[in-house]
């Protein structure tokens, strides 16, 4: 929806289950937010998240002292380790038109030896994320490598920083008629392909 002066929806919140609004009503949700859509302060431990915002914005604050707004192609990598609290709110900054949010969040369970590692937070700004273009294929490399492209330095104590890990996170856009073959995973690894039409 359009935003108001508090970056919340410029629409009635009547009839919504504020604090737990996961029903798509009028084309949007509040999630756990009561004034601004999103997820107020909450704890995590023992895993890491990779948050990819293709459209819209996320306001992040955490117990490590990090705070800021990211979006429009930026990626946030957070290793919760022994524990971190954070909030992820989705400000509706456009007051004259609808605010679209297109966000993917991937959770990785850390291996036993890293579950109590120090928490870590890293931003991958969209202009720093490697992009490989070839034959109607545009591939953004968040983690791993593909052909001549390699990801930016991964966070420490992350699946992406382990030399024995086959972790790859790629955002692939194909032109009509383009063909891309998913590279074979190393023995003992799995690949997951999520197709999304935006």
Question: What residue ranges belong to the model's regions?
Answer:
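A generic local secondary-structure boundary/capping motif
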Residues: 66, 90-97, 128-131, 158-161
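Short helix/loop capping segments that flank catalytic or ligand/cofactor-binding pockets
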Residues: 61-62, 79, 86-88, 115-118, ...
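"Short basic amphipathic alpha-helical interaction patches in structured regions
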Residues: 64-72, 90-93, 120-123
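Glycine- and acidic-residue-biased ligand/ion/polar-headgroup-sensing regions
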Residues: 45-65, 71-75, 81-85, 175-176, ...
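Conserved, well-structured core segments that form or line functional sites
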Residues: 102, 109-197
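Ligand-binding loop in jelly-roll beta-barrel domains
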Residues: 81-113
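Generic beta-strand structural signal
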Residues: 48, 68, 74-76, 86, ...
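N-terminal, Lys/Arg-enriched amphipathic/low-complexity engagement segments
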Residues: 1-51
